Amino acid sequence: MQKTELDDQKLVEEIARRIREILELLGENPEREGLKETPERVAKALLEMTSGLRTPPPQIKVFNLGDDGEVYEKNQIVLIKDVNFSSLCEHHMLPIIGKIHVAYIVSNSGKVAGFSKIIRIVNYYSSRLQIQERLVEQIADAIMNSEIKPKGVMVIGNAIHMCSYVRGVKDKEAKLVSVAYRGLFKTNRALQNHVFRLLDNANKVNLL
């Protein structure tokens, strides 16, 4: 067994011990049938859902649209829509579940990101205690500061928050939409609206 696996097992054991204590404080019997393995399951789930805190950020795979050194001045917009994500609200540690849409403007160098790498960035920053408003900012910064050096980045988050779904106001319909702008998208309303139109039109097309 590798050292990291040993460390992970110790974490699982320590978290599980505390979950048992919480169950007892709630008036439950952690030794009853149905709950015996719950503390360990919860510990593993929490570690999985916060894995972004303990792993390095993913590196973006770069592809070139043109020949090396060729200037690419077409201002192409790349849109990655409907990236499913889930995170844990840092206020109540309840799930946030929704979709992220990422748009970026290709730089003059013609560098674009590998499709799956954008998804990995979304997963990385959502795998921690989080708020949605910060999540879209972190994703936007990660892409804007990456090797593809885009002219602009726009990240849209749309999600339901279980902290308001199952407790408090218990609203089953409310969703939170948050948007982060970088580069040309920050001041160009026409570009912003263009992305929203792309999303709207894409939702009307059934590709599969």
From Swiss-Prot:
<feature type="binding site">
    <location>
        <position position="163"/>
    </location>
    <ligand>
        <name>Zn(2+)</name>
    </ligand>
</feature>
<dbReference type="GO" id="GO:0046654">
    <property type="term" value="P:tetrahydrofolate biosynthetic process"/>
</dbReference>
<keyword id="KW-0862">Zinc</keyword>
<keyword id="KW-0479">Metal-binding</keyword>
<keyword id="KW-0554">One-carbon metabolism</keyword>
<dbReference type="GO" id="GO:0003934">
    <property type="term" value="F:GTP cyclohydrolase I activity"/>
</dbReference>
<feature type="binding site">
    <location>
        <position position="89"/>
    </location>
    <ligand>
        <name>Zn(2+)</name>
    </ligand>
</feature>
<dbReference type="GO" id="GO:0005737">
    <property type="term" value="C:cytoplasm"/>
</dbReference>
<dbReference type="GO" id="GO:0008270">
    <property type="term" value="F:zinc ion binding"/>
</dbReference>
<dbReference type="GO" id="GO:0006729">
    <property type="term" value="P:tetrahydrobiopterin biosynthetic process"/>
</dbReference>
<dbReference type="InterPro" id="IPR020602">
    <property type="entry name" value="GTP_CycHdrlase_I_dom"/>
</dbReference>
<dbReference type="Pfam" id="PF01227">
    <property type="entry name" value="GTP_cyclohydroI"/>
</dbReference>
<comment type="pathway">
    <text>Cofactor biosynthesis; 7,8-dihydroneopterin triphosphate biosynthesis; 7,8-dihydroneopterin triphosphate from GTP: step 1/1.</text>
</comment>
<comment type="subunit">
    <text>Toroid-shaped homodecamer, composed of two pentamers of five dimers.</text>
</comment>
<dbReference type="InterPro" id="IPR043134">
    <property type="entry name" value="GTP-CH-I_N"/>
</dbReference>
<dbReference type="GO" id="GO:0005525">
    <property type="term" value="F:GTP binding"/>
</dbReference>
<dbReference type="InterPro" id="IPR043133">
    <property type="entry name" value="GTP-CH-I_C/QueF"/>
</dbReference>
<keyword id="KW-0342">GTP-binding</keyword>
<protein>
    <recommendedName>
        <fullName>GTP cyclohydrolase 1</fullName>
        <ecNumber>3.5.4.16</ecNumber>
    </recommendedName>
</protein>
<keyword id="KW-0547">Nucleotide-binding</keyword>
<dbReference type="GO" id="GO:0006730">
    <property type="term" value="P:one-carbon metabolic process"/>
</dbReference>
<dbReference type="InterPro" id="IPR018234">
    <property type="entry name" value="GTP_CycHdrlase_I_CS"/>
</dbReference>
<feature type="binding site">
    <location>
        <position position="92"/>
    </location>
    <ligand>
        <name>Zn(2+)</name>
    </ligand>
</feature>
<dbReference type="InterPro" id="IPR001474">
    <property type="entry name" value="GTP_CycHdrlase_I"/>
</dbReference>
<comment type="similarity">
    <text>Belongs to the GTP cyclohydrolase I family.</text>
</comment>
<keyword id="KW-0378">Hydrolase</keyword>
